[in-house]
Regions:
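Active-site mouth loops of central-metabolism enzymes
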Residues: 51-65, 141-143
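Internal amphipathic alpha-helical repeat/solenoid segments
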Residues: 62-71, 93, 102
């Protein structure tokens, strides 16, 4: 006997949309006045490190096609949209004279988005430091970059504040720390733990200064930070495994979550760094500023869990310090996985994140700002001219069930934003894995809705979905 279907409904005024970033969608065009960021420069000197040598100049041509793309936001039912301003499009050298073409571009884009009744969230930094600041002073290792960022942020608040509903200081600030200073995976591809810690500290200080500047420009402006709050699960309840998971979350999540929301750093993390002589020089006034200027809300990105165990081997005393000295990945038998991306799919992790925020971070307001499924070779799922991405729809539904359960249990979540609106360029993988509700034909730049794009419109219109 078939059970009657029922609706999973979300709270009134719940936001539905997607997230993207300027570096991954805009592209570069003659006369646009944009300066090089780290990715532009790195691609110029080491194109072989990018899949198929697909660089940041390719992307999804949003700079030229923004009007069509905004119409597609409407067609896919967006009530919210998160994008980013490219620092080097506004200030080609990171500071100094603003680029009039860049300033005007974002103004017209934001005005058009708002004219469609879409809630606009704008991120100020998505891994895209102006290269001039890296070249002249080692980028985020130099405190002068912190002040350059503060001035750039204030300029944006003053220039676009009348159009932006929610500001974001940084997207996933732990990622450049890990991949740029621990793992030789992002520029400046160093392996230097002391530099990594200094970069993390300066990034947090910059975020707090931006919060201060935002509220100085207008106390009613709302500003937050987007963090990938990947929960860490121990292999077992053995004390060594439990400790490994706790330390993994210290580095991965709490290193930015605690100072951003609580205004303080976790004492255990500070002690670990002190024992290894990795603490940077800290001005007590800076710590007071971090304490006083916490965020108004959180953006949470969630794709996969971490599963860890205690390290099996003692670290080589002559090797550089890596966080894997404290924990190592654990491959759980029977896990569900996205074979295209190699990531575990674990929907309950989203519920666990919500509980953590509720119980340990004052149930601060938050939105799920990234969640999605990247798939390679989606063209094989095309029928009658449209990609039938039922796997993506199922992925979203499965996560929304857990999010709905969390909200029912008191989570203060105000919206769900997928990654991403249109197939976009990924930092080192180019267009290998497609995430969009809208298909991008790289050869023609034609945009075509996938099945998920039509479904997402229904999801938004119904404020939920039928089981």
């Amino acid at each position: 006997m078939r059970e009657d279907k029922h609706m999973i409904n979300f709270p009134q005024d719940f936001l539905w949309g997607t997230s993207t970033s300027g570096p991954q969608t805009e592209g570069r065009f003659a006369g646009d006045g944009k300066g090089d960021n780290l990715w532009d420069y790195w691609y110029q000197v080491e194109p072989h490190r990018f899949r198929f040598q697909e660089g940041p100049g390719l992307t999804s041509t949003f700079y030229e096609n923004w009007e069509e793309d905004i119409e597609l936001l409407v067609e896919t039912g967006h009530t919210a949209f998160r994008t980013s301003i490219q620092w080097s499009r506004i200030f080609p050298e990171g500071r100094g004279e603003a680029n009039p073409a860049g300033v005007a571009f974002y103004r017209q884009v934001f005005e058009r988005i708002k004219s469609k009744g879409i809630h606009l969230m704008v991120n100020l930094y998505h891994f895209d430091l102006p290269f001039a600041l890296q070249e002249e002073g080692d980028g985020w290792e130099n405190k002068e970059t912190v002040y350059a960022y503060r001035d750039y942020a204030r300029f944006c608040f003053e220039t676009y504040g009348d159009l932006v509903d929610q500001w974001i200081t940084f997207n996933e600030p732990i990622v450049p720390v890990e991949f740029g200073y621990f793992y030789d995976a992002h520029y400046p591809h160093k392996v230097d733990a002391a530099a990594a810690v200094k970069v993390a500290y300066h990034t947090q200080l910059a975020s707090s200064l931006a919060v201060q500047a935002c509220h100085e420009v207008d106390p009613n402006y709302r500003i937050g930070v987007v963090l990938n709050l990947t929960p860490a699960y121990p292999r077992s309840q053995h004390p060594a495994d439990v400790k490994a998971a706790r330390i993994a979350e210290l580095f991965q999540a709490k290193s930015f979550l605690d100072p951003s929301v609580l205004g303080t750093y976790p004492p255990e993390l500070v002690e670990i760094l002190r024992e290894r002589a990795l603490l940077p020089e800290v001005d007590p006034n800076d710590l007071e500023l971090i304490k006083e200027h916490t965020v108004d809300f959180l953006g949470v990105n969630y794709y996969q869990p971490m599963r860890v165990s205690a390290p099996r081997y003692a670290p080589n005393p002559e090797s550089p310090m890596l966080v894997e000295q404290f924990y190592e990945p654990y491959v759980m038998p029977g896990r569900k996985i996205n074979p295209h991306r190699g990531w575990e799919i674990y929907e309950q992790g989203l519920y666990d994140i919500a509980q953590n925020i509720k119980e340990n971070y004052g149930n601060i307001e938050w939105l799920l700002t990234e969640n999605g499924m990247g798939v390679e070779g989606e063209e094989k799922f095309r029928q009658n001219g449209e990609i039938q991405d039922d796997y993506r729809i199922d992925f979203v539904k499965d996560h929304l069930r857990e999010l709905h359960r969390a909200i029912q249990d008191g989570a203060n979540c105000k919206g769900y934003l997928m990654w991403t609106f249109i197939d976009c360029w990924s930092w080192l993988n180019g267009y290998k894995n497609r995430y969009g509700l809208v298909e991008l034909d790289l050869a023609t730049q034609e945009r075509r809705l996938k099945k998920s794009g039509h479904w997402f419109r229904e999801l938004s219109q119904q404020n939920g979905f039928e089981e």
